Amino acid sequence: MECVPNFSEGRDLEKIEKIVDKFRAKAGVKLLDYSNDEDHNRLVVTVVGEPEALKDALLEAIGQAVELIDLTKHSGQHPRMGAVDVVPFIPIRGCTMDEAIALSKEVGEKVAALYRVPVFLYEKSASAPHRENLAAIRKGEFEGMEAKIKQPEWKPDFGPAERHPSAGT
């Protein structure tokens, strides 16, 4: 399985390395690439691995991001709503889309439980048609999510119906 998580940090190299190290250190996961962009204040990581090892590495990296990234102090050109903005899974080498969808739900549920961060599923994992398009979920970004998340149609798929104070959604 391949995963390309996006983190809302592209400027602080120490924070970037702490997040990326979670992928480097995990057996069964291979870090293929990562790049940061200061203007967008974003880190994009590309990793592959067996689903269980990938899930473990992601949970550690997401935990690190929740701890290190404060969106109340964040600025950048890219729309964002969370310290970890997206976690797309791409089925490769014998993995199916159904397995990718199942993994996205497992990770989302675990993130919400461990870090008290609300999670929205999108694209093929979406729980409703109006959530398939990521732009619709992102509309309002971090600042607007506090009110949006209280609307019944924007109740998170997992986690509390309130924005995490610093990590967003």
Q: Model-flagged regions — what are they?
A:
Residues 1-169:
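Long, contiguous binding/interaction regions
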